[in-house]
Regions:
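N-proximal low-complexity "stem/linker" segments adjacent to membrane-targeting elements
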Residues: 1-34
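Short, acidic, metal-binding catalytic loop of nucleotide-sugar glycosyltransferases
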Residues: 33-43
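Glycine-rich, basic loop-to-helix element that forms the pyrophosphate-binding segment
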Residues: 70-86, 184
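Short aromatic/hydrophobic "clamp" motif used to bind/position activated sugar donors
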Residues: 91
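Conserved donor NDP-sugar-binding/catalytic core segment of glycosyltransferases
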Residues: 103-134
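Short, flexible, basic/aromatic active-site loop/helix in glycosyltransferases
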Residues: 123, 138-157
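A short, conserved alpha-helix in the catalytic core of glycosyltransferases
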Residues: 164, 169-171, 178-209, 213
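Active-site-adjacent helix/loop segment of glycosyltransferases
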Residues: 205-281, 285
């Protein structure tokens, strides 16, 4: 079911912002407030793909919002639904637990005008859950590579679903039945020769604090989802190689996180203080990938956030 708020300023918006929601309101309140308060003169639509059915309040919708209620869909399926529903020439994505900068939408449009050949532009992700060492380590593993500073340049790797945008003409015409894993989609665009860029003028804050058990579960389910999305493209030999690589995956993930932190000259003390959490979380992720390569994604796509 789709519900539409007041119409966007023009029949076809320039920018579509996709937000996949899996938790009930008010989990996405900060995200939605940061989006609906963007410059009113910009031609924007906000597409909420709601897998809970109660992701937005029951009253009137905020301006420029299209609300697709699809209870029971995974966050990956919801993201695919949002991309398919987008009408703007530029299609952006953020997460329901993120807060975007006040000039985010305007900057997106300006940067896509500035770089007409860029098919995708990723921005900076900063930590908005900064009260505990655990939350910092959780953030650094997944989003440390995208926190500021980032070089403003063409690159083979751009931000995931927290802060990324594409010219719609470069998006794949169809998505897999199990939805969109953003890192996989970015990689496939790169392999097609699509120009990808990073730019720190686009900033979002990632706000996620799940407690110790919840964070461990999140890293396990994320790992299992990654493996599950890879499986259809793996030969038997490739699958066995991925299973074997899990023996060194914890060291690789921990080393990559540490290298990022020390290269960017940020959060070094926080990471050193959180080394036990780092070891625990990369182990949870690795166990998730191992289970995923053996048995598939299972119900993990419905348990990620």
């Amino acid at each position: 079911m789709e519900t539409t708020a007041s119409p966007v300023p023009s029949d076809l918006p320039r920018l579509s912002v996709v937000v996949a929601m899996v938790d009930p309101w008010p989990a996405a309140k900060a995200c939605m407030e940061s989006l609906v308060h963007q410059s009113p003169e910009e031609s924007i639509e906000i597409i909420v793909a709601d897998g809970n059915g109660n992701g937005l309040p029951a009253g009137g919708l905020p301006p420029r919002v299209r609300w697709h209620q699809k209870p029971g869909r995974s966050v990956f399926q919801l993201r695919a639904l949002g991309f398919a529903a987008a009408r703007g020439d530029i299609v952006a994505s953020t997460e329901d637990h993120c807060k975007v900068a006040p000039d985010w939408c305007r900057s997106l449009l300006e940067l896509h005008d500035l770089y007409p050949d860029a098919g995708g532009i990723g921005g900076a992700v900063e930590n908005g859950a900064d009260r505990s060492t655990l939350d910092w380590v959780h953030f650094l593993i997944a989003n440390g590579p995208y926190m500021r500073p980032n070089r403003h340049h063409t690159t083979g790797t751009i931000t995931g679903q927290a802060n990324v945008s594409f010219k719609r003409k470069f998006l794949p015409p169809e998505s897999r039945e199990d939805g969109v894993l953003q890192m996989e989609m970015n990689r496939r665009l790169r392999d097609r020769g699509v120009e990808l860029r990073m730019d720190d003028r686009l900033v979002v804050w990632h706000i996620q604090s799940l407690g110790l058990l919840g964070t461990c579960r999140m890293h396990f389910h994320t790992g299992r989802c990654i493996a599950g999305f890879r499986l259809p493209h793996l030969s038997t030999a490739g699958r066995l190689l991925r299973i074997a690589s899990c023996a060194i995956l914890p060291a690789f993930l921990a080393g990559r996180t540490a290298a990022t932190v020390f290269k960017k000259k940020r959060c070094r003390f926080r990471l050193v203080r959180g080394l036990p959490f780092l070891a625990l979380l990369v182990s949870c992720h690795t166990f998730g990938e191992l289970i995923g390569y053996w048995f598939g994604a299972g119900d993990s796509p419905w348990k990620t956030r």
